[in-house]
Curated annotation (Swiss-Prot):
Region of interest: Mn 1: 30-42
Lineage top rank: taxon: Eukaryota
Region Mn 2, annotated ranges: 69-83
Matching InterPro entries: MEDAG/TEX26
Organism: Homo sapiens (Human)
Region feature (Mn 4): 179-193
Lineage: Eukaryota, Metazoa, Chordata, Craniata, Vertebrata
The name this protein goes by in its record: Testis-expressed protein 26
Region: Disordered, residue numbers: 1-26
GO cellular component: cytoplasm
Region ranges (Mn 5): 233-247
Annotated segments matching region Mn 3: 144-157
Gene name in the database record: TEX26
Length: 289
C-alpha cells in the first residue's frame, strides 16, 4: 500500500513568502519587492584566459611570440612573389605548377606609328640595337607633358581657326531647343528704348535703375504730405482735422441773446474783433441771398 506523499504547503502561506502569524520573526512590512526579487547568487566563472584566440582572422597562442601582424597586414602588404608560381598550366591530369621559361608572347609591345612593324615582327624588342637618335628621342619624350601632346599650340589653333570658312553667326545656326513655359515666363525682360528715357526719378519710377535727367523738383508732394502727417499728434486729428471749422454754423446755432451775453463777458478789444467778424460775415451772407 502506497504511503501518502508530503503534503503540499498552503498557497496562502507561500504567496510572497509570507510566514504564519504565530512566528514572532514574521515581518509585517514585507513587500513584493523584498519577497519576489530576492538577491540571487550564482557561480562566478574563473578568470582564466584561453590558450588560443582568433584576433582579426589571425590565430596565435600564448606561447607564440607577439607579432604585429594581422589578417589585414597579411592581405594588403607588399610581398615578394615567388618565381615558382609565375606560370600555371592546365593539363588533362589537372592543374600543375612548375618552372618554365618566360615566353615572349606574354608581353605586349607597342611601337610608334611611323615605324614599320613588318621587319621587326620576328625580332624581340630588347634585341634590336637602338641608335643614338632613338635614345635621344626617348629621353626627350620623358619631358613632354600630356597637355603639350594632346592640346594644340595656341598659334596653331589660331591658324586653324582663320583657315576655316565658318560664318560669324555660327551661334544662330546651332539647333535651339523649343521654348518651354519656364523659359517664356522667366526670361530676361526686353528693354524698351521709349521707356528708358525718364526726365524724373520719383514716385512710382524711383525704383527703376535709371539716372534722373532734366530738372528735378527740390520739394516733392510726398515730402509735404509726410510733414503734414508728422505735425498731427493723433489719428483723429489726421483723419478729421482736414477742414476748418464753420464759424457761421456755430453762430447760427446760438440765439442773439446768448451772443450778447457772451460778448459782454469779454474784454473791450476781444469784443471789437468779434463784432467786426460778425458784421462782415453777416453782411456777405445777406448780399448772397
Amino acid at each position: 500500500m502506497e504511503q501518502p506523499g508530503p503534503r503540499a504547503p498552503d498557497p496562502s502561506l507561500c504567496h510572497h513568502n509570507l510566514q504564519p502569524t504565530d512566528d514572532p520573526n514574521w515581518d509585517s512590512y514585507a513587500t513584493t519587492m523584498r519577497t519576489a526579487f530576492t538577491p540571487k547568487t550564482g557561480a562566478v566563472p574563473a578568470l582564466i584566459r584561453q590558450n588560443g584566440i582568433r584576433r582579426l582572422g589571425y590565430t596565435y597562442s600564448l606561447s607564440d611570440p607577439i607579432l604585429n601582424q594581422t589578417q589585414y597586414s597579411d592581405e594588403y602588404t607588399w610581398k615578394s612573389h615567388s618565381k615558382e608560381d609565375l606560370i600555371k598550366t592546365e593539363t588533362s591530369r589537372g592543374i600543375k605548377s612548375h618552372k618554365s621559361h618566360l615566353n615572349e608572347d606574354i608581353f605586349l609591345w607597342t611601337l610608334p606609328h611611323c615605324q614599320q612593324t613588318g621587319t621587326l615582327k620576328n625580332c624581340l624588342p630588347w634585341k634590336i640595337p637602338a641608335s643614338m637618335k632613338e635614345v635621344n628621342k626617348a629621353l626627350s619624350n620623358q619631358f613632354i607633358s600630356l597637355t603639350k601632346r594632346d592640346f594644340v599650340d595656341r598659334s596653331k589653333a589660331q591658324k586653324i581657326k582663320k583657315s576655316s570658312h565658318l560664318s560669324l553667326e555660327w551661334k544662330k545656326l546651332l539647333p535651339q531647343p523649343p521654348d518651354t513655359e519656364f523659359r517664356r515666363n522667366y526670361q530676361i525682360p526686353a528693354k524698351i528704348p521709349e521707356l528708358q528715357d525718364f526726365s524724373f526719378k520719383y514716385g512710382c519710377y524711383s525704383s527703376l535703375p535709371v539716372a534722373s535727367q532734366g530738372l528735378v523738383p527740390s520739394v516733392l508732394h510726398s515730402y509735404l504730405r509726410n510733414q503734414e502727417h508728422t505735425k498731427k499728434q493723433t489719428t483723429y486729428q489726421s483723419d478729421y482735422d482736414k477742414t476748418y471749422p464753420d464759424f457761421l454754423m456755430l453762430l447760427n446755432s446760438f440765439t442773439s441773446s446768448q451772443v450778447k451775453e457772451y460778448l459782454q463777458s469779454l474784454s473791450y478789444k476781444d469784443r471789437q474783433i468779434i463784432d467786426r467778424f460778425i458784421r462782415t460775415h453777416c453782411d456777405t451772407n445777406k448780399k448772397k441771398k
